[in-house]
Amino acid sequence: MSSYTHETLPTQLSSEVEGDIKATYRAIEVSRPGQFSEVSRPLLDPGPGHVRIRVEACGVCHSDSGTVEGVFPINWPRVPGHEVVGRIDALGSGVQRWAVGQRVGVGFLGGACGYCEFCRNGDLVNCRNQGYTGIYHDGGYA
């Protein structure tokens, strides 16, 4: 078992401007099982159909320890955290149902494909192609 404590993980986004106009954010990244580091990453614009969220809080869940300990098949590095609350701060093209400033929550399920048998029947929870937040794509320890 890895030696780490969840209490050492910051849960708020710190956005800063470096140089002229290059915005970054800080995150807690796991570069390999049990190896945490605080990193600065570029603040990217959201892609089509996506939103960018400024994290206000992120819970710590037992499944996050699985991410940290390498239990899941993960492409490293990874930012854990799937119990996220924040506000939308940017919209990708084509986004119509959301607004900048709107408070949102992000859970474990990181989306559904919309094409598999389950999705076609409205059963998004059992989508065969979904990615999990903090496991298959970066989470809220940012």
What do the PLM-derived regions correspond to, one by one?
Residues 42-58, 68-117, 137:
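Glycine-rich beta-strand-centered segment in the early N-terminal region that forms part
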Residues 1-26:
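Basic/polar N-terminal segments that are highly enriched at the extreme N-terminus
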Residues 13-16, 73-76, 130-134:
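Short, P/G- and charge-enriched loop/turn segments at secondary-structure junctions
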Residues 61:
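Conserved Rossmann-like nucleotide-cofactor binding loop
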Residues 108-142:
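Phosphate-binding beta-alpha-beta segment of Rossmann-like dinucleotide-binding domains, i.e.
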Residues 28-36:
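Extracellular beta-rich ligand/substrate-recognition surface
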